[in-house]
């Protein structure tokens, strides 16, 4: 097979984007394999910067590593070109598998298609395949997909988060100390026991050399960017978020897709300031597209348990507010975890309703405008299409797999939870996947379904029902034992009650208690 991406035939949508279908995925897998078994375009084109802590990783799966200040002082481009990253790139180009990318290797070793393949098919990656294969790995390069957190200022303390990304977590750990699990055993673990909370993040009052370097580097990086995404903390609590918006208004990149994560639970005054800024950016036509991401992984009080500080009804209201605005997309981002299992179906029902209500069927709109025939088309969809010219889809869904902290990983759930909740949830979603030219995008996209499917299938293969010894395997027993201690400590600190909030998981809670007592020898 040719090593050239541009010489190959790819099945594309009508808008020119490459489809994430089985044929294209297999073709990309083979194309990457021509360079090496661990070759991944995301390592060369995607970066997430945690400027509050001075950490970076490429892509989002590997554990973040520190950006050495001595490297940064010599060259601000070290934000994306640390010696660590250059070494990993060289390994990929020389046919090796970097150890930090173990998530993808696990999926592939189980016979699946990992994010390495899916990400490499994205236009911000695939368009650069041919030039990347000519590199040695030691070059200073620019990303095409930049995600940045300016600090940990946040008004929430999600259960799966921590002090690196939440100032509320910092305050809780200062007040109560680290969360200890399986205490007194040889597998005792502590959540952020050895972290210097005073030095973990640069405060607003301190000079932050990483943010200083960012604003030196960003003007040079901007022309190379296809995606710029701001995350947190809570981005709306950072002045650099609003500085970014103003910078983009004054320095257009009309090939750029700009997006911001927000918990949508900030005070009204701050929310209104954000809405004003984002509407001015849209009216300036300085960027190609704008997307607002909001995180929620379950429904109602279960979602609020997982994300302490979340106002679920306010989030629902503000999601619809964004969906009704001109030419701005809203995407629900659900970091799938153990707390998602029993109410994710209700979340999907809501997202499906939003898609039905707000997503214009661009294919039928074009057909209507050309022929005058209204083929199964609501007239409101024509209006939505006209006021959203930059977006084929107004309401989207992303389902990343939460791997850390490990004791909140869904792979520790029981067979009953898998069979009674996850399989039916997957079936619900599969029945509403729309992949035809006729109905797109009134249902779930294939790529949205695939993300949930990979998570559920990973759980099924991790702990197979016909392998009885797996249910009592050391790793599973330890993870469940840790989970028991974790939720009990969260309940004590936050005045919550896991079993009252998740009565359908009471049996799982007891299984975790038994695992905990087994390890502790009770």
For the regions a protein language model found, what residue spans apply to each?
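Short, intrinsically disordered, charge-biased short linear motifs at domain edges
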Residues: 22-29, 80-94, 142-149
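N-terminal pre-triad scaffold of radical SAM enzymes
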Residues: 45-56, 135-164, 226-230
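Core AdoMet radical
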Residues: 143-153, 164-209, 222-239, 251-274, ...
């Amino acid at each position: 097979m040719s090593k050239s991406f541009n010489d190959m035939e790819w099945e594309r949508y009508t808008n020119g984007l490459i489809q994430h279908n089985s044929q294209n995925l297999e073709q990309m897998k083979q194309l990457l394999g021509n360079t090496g078994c661990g070759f991944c375009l995301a390592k060369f084109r995607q970066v997430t910067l945690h400027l509050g802590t001075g950490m970076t990783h490429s892509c989002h799966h590997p554990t973040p590593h520190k950006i050495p200040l001595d490297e940064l002082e010599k060259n601000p481009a070290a934000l994306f070109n640390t010696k660590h990253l250059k070494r990993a790139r060289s390994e990929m180009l020389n046919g090796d598998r970097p150890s930090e990318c173990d998530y993808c290797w696990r999926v592939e070793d189980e016979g699946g298609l990992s994010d390495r393949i899916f990400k490499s098919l994205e236009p911000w990656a695939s368009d650069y395949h041919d030039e990347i294969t000519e590199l040695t790995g030691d070059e200073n390069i620019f990303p095409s997909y930049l995600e940045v957190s300016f600090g940990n200022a946040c008004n929430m303390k999600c259960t799966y988060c921590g002090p690196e990304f939440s100032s509320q977590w910092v305050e809780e750990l200062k007040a109560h100390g680290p969360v200890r699990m399986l205490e007194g055993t040889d597998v005792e673990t502590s959540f952020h026991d050895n972290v210097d909370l005073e030095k973990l993040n640069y405060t607003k009052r301190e000079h932050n050399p990483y943010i200083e370097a960012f604003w030196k580097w960003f003007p040079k990086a901007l022309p190379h960017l296809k995606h710029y995404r701001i995350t947190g903390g809570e981005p709306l609590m950072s002045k650099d978020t609003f500085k970014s918006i103003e910078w983009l208004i004054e320095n257009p990149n009309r090939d750029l897709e700009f997006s911001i994560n927000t918990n949508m639970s900030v005070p009204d005054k701050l929310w209104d300031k954000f809405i004003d800024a984002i509407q001015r950016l849209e009216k300036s036509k300085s960027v190609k597209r704008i997307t607002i991401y909001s995180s929620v992984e379950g429904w109602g009080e279960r979602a609020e348990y997982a994300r302490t500080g979340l106002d679920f009804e306010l989030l629902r209201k503000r999601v619809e507010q964004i969906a009704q605005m001109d030419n701005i997309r809203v995407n629900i981002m659900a970091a799938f975890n153990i707390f998602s299992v029993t109410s994710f179906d209700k979340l999907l029902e809501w997202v499906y309703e939003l898609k039905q209500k707000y997503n214009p069927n661009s294919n039928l709109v074009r057909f209507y405008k050309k022929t005058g025939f209204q083929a199964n088309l609501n007239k409101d969809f024509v209006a939505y299409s006209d006021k959203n010219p930059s977006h084929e889809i107004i309401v989207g869904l992303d389902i990343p797999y939460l791997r850390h902290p490990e004791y909140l990983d869904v792979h520790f759930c029981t067979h009953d939870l898998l069979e009674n909740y996850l399989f039916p949830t997957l079936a619900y979603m599969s029945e509403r996947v729309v992949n035809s030219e006729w109905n797109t995008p009134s249902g779930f996209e294939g790529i949205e379904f695939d993300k949930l499917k990979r998570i559920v299938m990973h759980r099924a293969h991790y702990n197979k029902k016909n392998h009885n010894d797996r249910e009592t395997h050391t790793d599973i027993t330890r993870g469940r034992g840790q989970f028991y201690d974790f939720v009990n400590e969260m309940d004590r600190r936050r005045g919550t009650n896991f079993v009252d909030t998740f009565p359908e998981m009471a049996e799982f809670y007891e299984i975790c208690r038994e695992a905990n007592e087994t390890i502790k020898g009770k």
